[in-house]
From Swiss-Prot:
Gene it is expressed from: trmD
Function, in words: Specifically methylates guanosine-37 in various tRNAs.
Predominant localisation class: cytoplasm
InterPro entries on file: Alpha/beta_knot_MTases (IPR029028), tRNA_m1G_MeTrfase_C_sf (IPR023148), tRNA_m1G_MeTrfase_TrmD (IPR002649), tRNA_m1G_MTases_N (IPR029026), tRNA_MeTrfase_TRMD/TRM10 (IPR016009)
One GO cellular component term: cytosol
Assembly description: Homodimer.
CDD domains, per database record: TrmD-like
Catalytic activity: guanosine(37) in tRNA + S-adenosyl-L-methionine = N(1)-methylguanosine(37) in tRNA + S-adenosyl-L-homocysteine + H(+)
Name of the protein in its database record: tRNA (guanine-N(1)-)-methyltransferase
Positions bound to S-adenosyl-L-methionine: G119, I139, G140, D141, Y142, V143, L144
Organism: Chromohalobacter salexigens (strain ATCC BAA-138 / DSM 3043 / CIP 106854 / NCIMB 13768 / 1H11)
Amino acid sequence: MWIGVVSLFPEMFEAITRYGVTGRAVDQGLLEVDFWNPRDYATDKHRTVDDRPYGGGPGMLMKVATLRPAIAEARRDAERRGCAPARTRVVYLSPQGRRLDQRGVRELADLEALIVVAGRYEGIDERVVEADIDEEWSIGDYVLSGGELPAMVMVDAVSRLVPGVLGHGDSALEDSFSEGLLDCPHYTRPETIDGRQVPDILLSGNHAAIRRWRLKQSLGRTWLRRPELLEGRALDREQQRLLDEFIAEQATSQNVGRTEERRPLEE
């Protein structure tokens, strides 16, 4: 997959192009990431990349005269690579955008070319959004200093779904949210830590039972911690049965806990 990034601080992206899963993907040629810095399109001696907003007020906006050429050049590069326009998308990281979730990540990973625009200052001219941006995306309802970190989140999430990037073919399928659910608990050696033991089922070697346990824990953890993810979700018969079992086990555990709290101390 090819990803183009428009950013005033391309050096920040070395965190994902040189390290970890995405760094290995770049080294192996599975993922290619190129950069366009609007500052390279400045014509004045100060290489100005910001401008005052009409109407006054605090803050500055990214300069149109340097931002648009960077986006246009990234689009042309995608075309030169033979990427179909219908499978090329320019996205802008913005608080006004669609919330990024795993379904959205899958949509973006199906593209041939993804161009990510990382904003700075107070944002970009609305006319640039209308003319040059295909979609706006957000990673959450909070304020950051710029779009580079959200862009890195998007690039990392998308690259994980590129065939061959993850070492194990099922890793992406088993990630949290891959099926709209939280992940199940995981355990490694040793079998006992401070008196806490690995669940017996995981030591049984019964792969069918382990799969069932993991699905139950995934459903239950979602019900406990992110119940909104289950709203409107149609569970199949097995999923509903496992969730009901988990809820019943939780109720039993809580009742036992309350009984223990009320038990008088022995004299």
